[in-house]
A protein has these predicted regions:
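P-loop NTPase nucleotide-binding module
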Residues: 23
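Periplasmic OmpA-like peptidoglycan-binding domain that tethers envelope proteins to the cell wall
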Residues: 4, 10-20, 33, 45-115
Length: 115
């Protein structure tokens, strides 16, 4: 089972701090997943627009930081710690071409339930 969340709902551009407006939704999702078994893979994806900051030297670093933030948020006040596995893919697995009109679809978090 895969849940895909558009990054615009979760993060500001170039950042890995969760937007406060999405926090309650993520908490409800985490609580609902407590009743499941198996690992939960959280994968961060970006578009191919280059980023190079001291905090995020590449899209891979940004995507991993975002996946880690989602995992940390989901682990808070739940029994999911130890089942959550964050990973970053950067721009390596786009859903669509990275044209200006489509690239936003490539900026996402995927949550996979691995039974």
């Amino acid at each position: 089972i895969r849940i895909t969340i558009n990054n615009e709902s979760l993060f500001n551009s170039g950042e890995a701090i969760l937007l406060p407006s999405f926090q309650p939704i993520l908490e409800k999702l985490a609580l609902s997943l407590e009743g499941t078994k198996g690992k939960i893979l959280i994968t961060g994806h970006t578009d191919d627009s280059p980023i190079s900051t001291s905090q995020y030297p590449s899209n891979w670093h940004l995507s991993l930081a975002r996946a880690t933030q989602v995992a940390n948020s989901m682990a808070k006040n739940t029994g999911l710690m130890g089942r959550l596995w964050p990973e970053g893919k950067g721009s390596a697995e786009p859903l669509v071409s990275n044209t200006n009109s489509d690239k936003a679809l490539n900026r996402r978090i995927e949550i996979d339930l691995l039974f």
